[in-house]
């Protein structure tokens, strides 16, 4: 089955055929580093990291660009409100975004260009638009006229006579529907020299310029949040077409994280930060939660849903560790094999993570029944459990949540001292229990087990001794 993705521009599922054989090119609108990231921002990073992983698994060499918008009205306004240099403000929150991406195991992009590093290219791009008759300069501002482009509005379905660019009328606009490519300099704001006077770039121009610089005039996929479809992505297309570039061949948009049915946003005061949520669940569990819904669907946040997802992940993790233990006791290493056919079909159906996860859980459920026999050394059971474990690792690897992946081991190591301390205490209790069992002191053995259960610790007896884990409740 060929990968099919829902193209927002054509509003239909389309077979994904890369522009260049064996390669895939993806541009993701990254962060505007105006304030701390919340999980609404991070959902996009996780969703399209999974896309990237699947393209890579399919054997494609993926060029993945995720930009940083480090000059913007909101950045300037917030920096001014707090009496801080704009560049320092942007750098501070860029570091916070990077930390959050790292915590959630998001693979770094192939390149992460910054808007402020591409002003010469933006000036050149504007000149092409003006030369083609689609743009004009007035009093240091540069505008683009959507009315000059017959396909304007095709992505978002916006009607020209009803659209609102969400910006002020501007000095010298010929039509209120025209949008800004370049903003004339204002006192106290950063600015750069151009043939039309000093100023700074508009948001839309930044992305079109960087996407085409690194991926070419035409590339495969442009991705981003649903809220960016208009005006941002519509205007990116307009700029590219005005300059004569074909631009993105497929458009993918992820749904919002919502609370009480409303989009998570700072303006509504319903923001959940990554550090706060990591007080409730581990980073890998938060990633699992954010990636578990279909990328195009809305994800309604609740703490109960987050905890439920974390419990679901722990069931998968428990099996992988058990399979790894079985492999180790039989002088084998639990690697990664191939994903199942059902998993492949799910992922090829518009990156259908819910169906893909259902397949992972199915494999785990069917294999758990053979764990006891495998622990006893039954050769058929060992082979079955290890084979299933390697399949599960492969599938979870595509989703970015393989429990044995080094990145999760490194992140877990940050809090490893706490786990080691707990393990020492639990092992002391288990030693008491083991001694009592050897002496047939069942009352003491049961009392130890009950104490541990009351503390949320589940004990499992295996041929090689007792093992413990935290309860899923």
From Swiss-Prot:
One of its GO terms (biological process) is cysteinyl-tRNA aminoacylation. SMART domains: DALR_2. A motif ('HIGH' region) lies at residues 31-41. It is found in: Cytoplasm. A motif ('KMSKS' region) lies at residues 263-267. InterPro entries: Cys-tRNA-ligase, Cys-tRNA-synt_Ia_DALR, Cys-tRNA/MSH_ligase, CysS_C, Rossmann-like_a/b/a_fold, tRNA-synt_1_cat_dom, tRNAsynth_Ia_anticodon-bd. It holds the Pfam family tRNA-synt_1e. GO terms for molecular function: ATP binding; cysteine-tRNA ligase activity; zinc ion binding. Zn(2+) binds at residues 29, 207, 232, 236. ATP binds at residue 266. It catalyses: tRNA(Cys) + L-cysteine + ATP = L-cysteinyl-tRNA(Cys) + AMP + diphosphate. Belongs to the class-I aminoacyl-tRNA synthetase family. This is Cysteine--tRNA ligase. It comes from Corynebacterium kroppenstedtii (strain DSM 44385 / JCM 11950 / CIP 105744 / CCUG 35717).
